[in-house]
Amino acid sequence: MDKKKILLVEDDTALSGVYKSRLDLEGFDVREVNNGEEALTAAIEYKPDLILLDAMMPKISGFDVLDILRNTPDTTNIRVIMLTALSQPKDKERAENL
């Protein structure tokens, strides 16, 4: 059985390491990138089953990455979970609307 593929997009290397270690232990095939530009390229090339996407990143924000993913035919159906320390209702609403 093929492992489910997860694209982990997180610019904080300490957090990324914790997430990846746990996901590896659970048997997932995890690819890590640390900015929005790399995330867009990896989403098309890696074809993950799920993307764990940090909202606040350098170069391209997670919100902008999600918007691009949803408007790109090859990535529109990939499931995405946003990760963020943002706590304002407007931030949650923005992510949900994408």
Where do the language-model regions lie?
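Two-component/phosphorelay signaling modules centered on CheY-like receiver
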Residues: T13-R31
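Conserved acidic carboxylate
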Residues: E10
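The feature encodes the CheY-like receiver
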Residues: S16, P58, D67, T76, ...
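Hydrophobic residue at a beta-alpha junction
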Residues: V33-N34, M57-I60, L69
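Active-site beta3 strand of CheY-like receiver
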Residues: Y46-L52
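Conserved Asp/Asn-Gly motif in the active-site loop of CheY-like receiver
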Residues: V33-E37, K92
